[in-house]
Amino acid sequence: AFNYYGLPVYSPESSVTLVPENFDRETNQVNQTIQAKIGVESKEDAPVGYLLDLGYTNFSHKYALSKEQDGPTEHTFDVKFDLNARFGGEQRIGLGGNVEYFNYSLPTMGGQEYLEFENHAEATLSPYYKVSGDNWNLKLGANIMFVTGDNSKFMASPNITADVEVADKTELYLVAGGKLYSNSMYEISQVNRYINPTMELLPSRNYLDGTVGIRSGIAPGFWFDVFGGYKITSDEVFFAPTLLAPSVQGDIFANTSRALQANAKHAFGGVNLKYSYQQLFDINLKGVYNSWNVDDIEDAYGKPEMELTAGITVRPISQVTASLDYYLATGRKTFLGRSEGEKMKNINELNLTGTYTLNDTFGLYLKLNNVLFQKYELYYGYPM
């Protein structure tokens, strides 16, 4: 359970200041999840490979926009499958995919449903061919995806992976894929639990998610990965606070996030470094630069321009580990109703973790978050 403790954000067309005390910042929202899964899979090296997974997810919001309104419930039925056969030595041909059906139980007021969520299905079919050589691997395939309902769509994307060893412990690699993101109630709540629980989102159609790079472990204990990529997505999701007018002050929740959807192109590049010295310590450092180009909205709201992740783990004795993990995200903006985006404070967080192993069964664990006591907002209006 959690509450919408964030500060209310006023609409720029209004000259009246919103008073936080006039909104509900205390009632606990409850997002309940019930899941069941069952599946069967062949051994990895079987001449004929198969996989079948069946899943069900029941996800519900206890409330809509106030404790006086019941929230919706989402039922997801999911089937994942793969069938492939080996031939000619190290070659395989196969067909994989998944089918999801989303069904909604909606609350009523005066005998009428007051929310709009459409029952629909989403499916992906992925034919592919795999082949391996002495120092290379190749997969050629495609993803064929479609959505039913009023917003029915059909799309296709590549499904290609390749890598080749160009020197000792050094390889070039390429990944070119795509995906249909359902943006279901359950999936969006895993990203942002403060999302407006009455908002239905369109699926995001990722036509291309490509990465090329070189990675190497040529030096003892040292590993690096230099990479760059490009993504093309329709109806990408960007979070911004809901802008409120004074007339809505009352018992509604103070700050719910809304999802702005826009076509987006995302270029990125970065480097990932790791060093390990025997069993005494590990060091990792990763930096990524992001460049966004979006249609219909001014900025890629909430998305960082630069990300830096660093960590060190020390093992003074075999039973004890101590870890420091650092994350920095810069260049984020949010939408407050004006043409120019509002800059957000950088995420600047250092976490400390310690573990002590008592035996093969039991151990002790301690984690301290934000030990530098930095103030920032992961979502606008929600200070950490």
PLM ranges: what are they?
Residues 1, 34-38, 50-52, 75-83, ...:
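One face of beta-strands
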Residues 1-51, 55-76:
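Flexible loop and strand-edge segments within Gram-negative outer membrane beta-barrel domains
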Residues 3-7, 57-59, 100-102, 144-145, ...:
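Short glycine-rich beta-strand segments
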Residues 9-22, 65, 70-71, 96, ...:
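Short, flexible helix-coil linker/hinge segments at the edges of structured domains or between repeats
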Residues 43-49, 87-90, 131-136, 167, ...:
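Edge/loop elements at the starts and ends of beta-strands within beta-rich repeat scaffolds
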Residues 56-58, 73-75, 82-92, 98-105, ...:
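Phosphate/ribose-recognition catalytic cores of enzymes acting on nucleotide-derived substrates
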Residues 92-103, 107, 116-147, 276-287:
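Surface-exposed extracellular loop regions of Gram-negative outer-membrane beta-barrel proteins
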Residues 137-141, 145-384:
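Exposed, low-structure sequence patches enriched in small/polar residues
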